[in-house]
């Protein structure tokens, strides 16, 4: 038997999709260019000028961490840690927090820790 035809005749007009509806090919998102950081060229050993700066300037900072010293004196973090241990041994800085990941020092005050109540 042949297929039945619409009594009205002709084909139904194809339904148009609304714009912005899901599906279809959307414009592909491009990868953003990552931020490029300059290579740090930090010193591995103290020279005399930097060593003097460690003793004069670093002990005046309120917050002293290896990362702060490394950034300001342009030395490696391991060298900054060693310098801060030396300053602590001489009593020029005082350890506030000793965490396994970060050590925080502050300048040593003249008065021995006097707690005012």
Swiss-Prot record:
It comes from Caenorhabditis elegans. Coiled coil: none annotated. One of its GO terms (molecular function) is structural constituent of ribosome. Belongs to the eukaryotic ribosomal protein eS25 family. Residues 1-34 are annotated as: Disordered. Keywords: Ribonucleoprotein, Ribosomal protein. The keyword Protein biosynthesis does not apply. It comes from the Eukaryota. Residues 25-34 have a biased composition (Basic residues). GO terms for cellular component: cytosolic small ribosomal subunit. Transmembrane segments: none annotated. This is Small ribosomal subunit protein eS25.
């Amino acid at each position: 038997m042949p297929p039945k035809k619409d009594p009205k005749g002709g084909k139904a007009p194809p339904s148009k999709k609304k714009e912005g509806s899901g599906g279809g090919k959307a414009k592909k998102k491009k990868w953003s260019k990552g931020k490029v950081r300059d290579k740090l060229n930090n010193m591995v050993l103290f020279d005399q000028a930097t060593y003097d700066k460690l003793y004069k300037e670093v002990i005046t900072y309120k917050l002293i961490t290896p990362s702060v010293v490394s950034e300001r004196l342009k030395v490696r973090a391991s060298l900054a840690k060693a310098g801060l241990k030396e300053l602590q041994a001489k009593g020029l800085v005082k350890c506030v927090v000793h965490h396994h990941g970060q050590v925080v020092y502050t300048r040593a005050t003249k008065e021995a820790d006097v707690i005012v109540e």
